[in-house]
Amino acid sequence: MIRPVGAVVLGIGVMIALCAGVGMVWDQFAPDPSRPQGGAAELALSAIIVSTVGLIAFLYGNRFVSERISRREALLAVSLIWIAAGACGAIPFILGAGMSVDDAFFESVSGLTTTGATVIADIEGRLSRPLLLWRSLIQWLGGMGIVVLFVAVFPNLGAGGKHLFRGEVPGTTAEGLRPRIAETSFALWKLYGAFTIIEIALLKILGLDLFDAVCHAFTTMSTGGFSTLDSSVGGFDSAAVEYVIATFMLIGTVNYGLYYGLLRTGNWRS
């Protein structure tokens, strides 16, 4: 039960490092003087802290409990994963934006659960682009479910992975999507990613810069609603952009199991 939590925490550390690297490259080759500069170093430090904790839990967690996960343990593991993810996701806000622990945890949990509430009053003046990218990414990860991603990346859990998947995605759709849960998880994430890429392309065509297009596609597909602007999507002053974002928000509200069944068999009821 500890090992799955460690794996997800390790994965979050890798994602933070990715945001640090991408954000640093963005600032280097396409600087935006209107936004706070830097932030990559703070995210890199956050990534080191989170990855170290996750690696230790992943490598040594199975020494304290049975490696095989029962259904009851999986439900507890899913709960622990979300709590740990919220705590780890808050570290970049603490180090990169100087937020208090409670505000940072609120922002992180709001993002991961795609709630969309925020405690940041001055987004454009307070958050650097690496941190804005992280803030958008946590909504995208939470939109499909970090546990579903974990099961796809670590397919060797066997029955434990199946119980984790059902703990994250309960109901008849989770029971009958596909015999191999890891393949199902990977297929759902591929579909989710494809919709995201299409939206990024459309927003870029409509005139958004690549950074804003990526961030808003992340928060649109998850139906979370975080923005890189204080005035949100209205700041772009474009009806076409609003229609595209509204369309993909509607797409994001549909159960992805239905999309999967339609693509696989041509039948919604499958």
Could you tell me what each predicted segment is?
Residues 1-270:
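Membrane-proximal intracellular helices of multi-pass ion channels
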